[in-house]
Amino acid sequence: MIVITDLDGTLAHAAWRANLMHDWDAYHAASIADKPNMPMILAVNALSKYCGVACLTSRPERWRQLTNDWLLKYDVLLHHLIM
């Protein structure tokens, strides 16, 4: 079994940067400051012990390193990050 989750608005609280949507680069760059949605992260981490967990995000590939840094900062246990 594979569980699929989203990132912005699911694992990360992203609503605070909605005012930046007119400038996608600024919007995605600001994502490093997103606060974690800890109940969702804890659920994903628990599931990752029993099945594959993939995060499917619409973030562009060029934001992969920033996204990985954020995921590592909050110890999100994923098997795949699909961008």
Predicted regions: what is each one?
Residues 1-83:
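Alpha-helical substrate-recognition element adjacent to the catalytic core
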